């Protein structure tokens, strides 16, 4: 599948940045959306001459009205509809339940779930009108069960995965694909802040290759790396009391408050 027009959120760093470069190098016009305009400009300059094009789209995905305007503008520049839209922007900081602040919970759920679902739903009408297109949501292996110390993050990514599952049913026969990506640990700015072991962690380039290959094949579920996928699927199969006991044994200790 050759995508000519691609819209990616969270494109200034990590997976989003890698995806933007990969598709642009394949000849696509990539609308790279993120808050940090300077990083987007640097991304556009990194693209070699003769490849596709990266169009910087300074955007805070939390602002849903701004998202709609940005996607509509990208559609207009693409002749009516986008070929591929990837809801990649996300946030999350491991936090023990006793230290959760409702404002942080609201922010994580709004960006990871509401804003991501908005990205995809805004792009759908034009895709349906042209009879083809692909929407992709970046969920997480953390969505398979509620991970200790990650209540808001796990919930937000599980909600996105369920949203996409519903889309797949509703969009049957329209020519539109709805794909879900379940990354494990990837070396990015976000995971660099983690203070706990991250087994089977991948470089961003490795992860991007896996994602691009899966999207090209139209795989409804793209999960990686395999050892961590098998582990999380095993945990997902456990009865609730057993999982809760196992979770309590592997849970990171609650950080001590200073002072």
Report the location of each language-model feature.
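Substrate-binding pocket helix/loop in short-chain dehydrogenase/reductase
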Residues: 96-97, 101-107
